[in-house]
Amino acid sequence: MRMSEYFRILQGLPDGSFTREQAEAVAAQYRNVFIEDDQGTHFRLVVRQDGTLIWRSWNFEDCAGYWMNQYIRDFGILK
């Protein structure tokens, strides 16, 4: 691992609801975090492990970002 990779600062989500831009920035950092159920103004951000759903949150839910950050920290696979 190069030092630049080791010290890379990852973008997380705010503790509450989050925007599409924030979700896209986070999903772009991980191989197993995706935007699904896209209905335009609202969508789900999901974490999967070997195709199995680990956690999902609608972008407008209270505390959505807080819980998503916890599951990404524990299960996220960096690109």
Curated annotation (Swiss-Prot):
Keyword entries, A-Z: Plasmid
InterPro entries: DUF905 (IPR009253), YkfF-like_sf (IPR038612)
One Pfam family of this chain: DUF905
Superkingdom field: Bacteria
SUPFAM superfamilies noted in UniProt: YcfA/nrd intein domain
Keyword S-adenosyl-L-methionine recorded: no
Family: Belongs to the UPF0401 family.
Name of the protein described by the UniProt record: UPF0401 protein YubL
Gene: yubL
